[in-house]
Amino acid sequence: MTKKKAVRKHIKLTSHPGGDGATPIPIHWGASDPGERGPVVGTLTDSAKRNVIGTHSGSYAVYRALAVAAGVLDPQHTADLTNTSPWHSFGPHPQWFDAEKIVSIDPFGAVVNDVFRDYYKDGYDIRPSIAVTKAHLNMPELHTAIEEGRLKPDGDLLRDNGECCVTKISFEPVWYLPGVAQRFEVEESKLRHILFEQTGGMFPELVTRVDLNVFLPPIGGMTAYLFGDPGMVHQPETKLTVRVHDECNGSDVFGSDICTCRPYLVHGIEECVRGAQAGGSGVIVYFRKEGRALGEVTKFLVYNARKRQKGGDRAEEYFARTECIAGVQDMRFQRLMPDALHWLGITRIDRFVSMSSMKYDAIVRYGIEIKERVRIPDELVPEDAKVEIDAKLAAGYYTEGEVPDSEELSKAKGRKFKA
């Protein structure tokens, strides 16, 4: 018996408004009623029902395509969302309904199977873009903090075995294009054209489908870790400790000592635990922006250039080496970062565990008050990371101490490569 070949559908390289006779459900971003706002339909099971550009899972959408191509995933599979609801319900908060406060995540992304239940009955395949669960963190630095007496187990948040109990929230990026354009102070049409061109023409609908105002970009999202009662995070009387952290795989995971990323991340976690144990709450938001969003290959090229340059690895050339290779010092653009804090309902941060002027300025600019800024203790800065910390202090990062002068910046402090 011969196996019947699947018949491929005609491929449309692009689409146009009304081209297939279907009228997508409009998305009225910022509407307080989910029915009026409308669902984000980014699935591929029925293309006529889609009302966004792009698809779910961020950068992992490509792996989904590979799974379909390999024959291990049915392209018509729909998710069974039984027992997947958030273990803790967040919001709705006033920021959810302000089209200028949240532009890069779907406020209703965690509860789509509740608030859009009627659409499921009509055959719409709607996927969550936010998931909320519980987790235990087990990090050697927390064990050390307990041994040295900086933290004390309480049997609830921090256990005797060193495990820390947290609420964990994963966000996929969902961009409201008019709002993103406003954040970057460009015309929406210009943003659409440049996104299309600079991704190699990956999403022609950015140009042809001006009726679709939501884009699911193929990039990483972020994860929030909440310490203490998650229901207290948004309350005005709660003393809140926050660290916003951008991914650094080499340091965060493997302990590379050329930067302060893991030490500062762990310091932030310790401060969050301490704050929550004192009756407040703590929040760590971890963004996938490897190498200042320049990527890890670029980052490693910069490391090589720094170590091999004439005069050695020194702070005065720290940013210049990045700019020579990447054409820019930093592409993280913290303007979208406050959205996760707004989703949590945060209006004030009592202790902001960061020295970054970019992060501080973005949070304050978009309506969140910061009472106190907390720098990384000197003893936590690795020897090879002193180049980084000096360069950042000279560039305007927060400190209560002295800013390195030109003579100090010219000293080679970075480790030399051995032949």
Describe the function of each predicted region.
Residues 1-419:
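Catalytic domains of riboflavin
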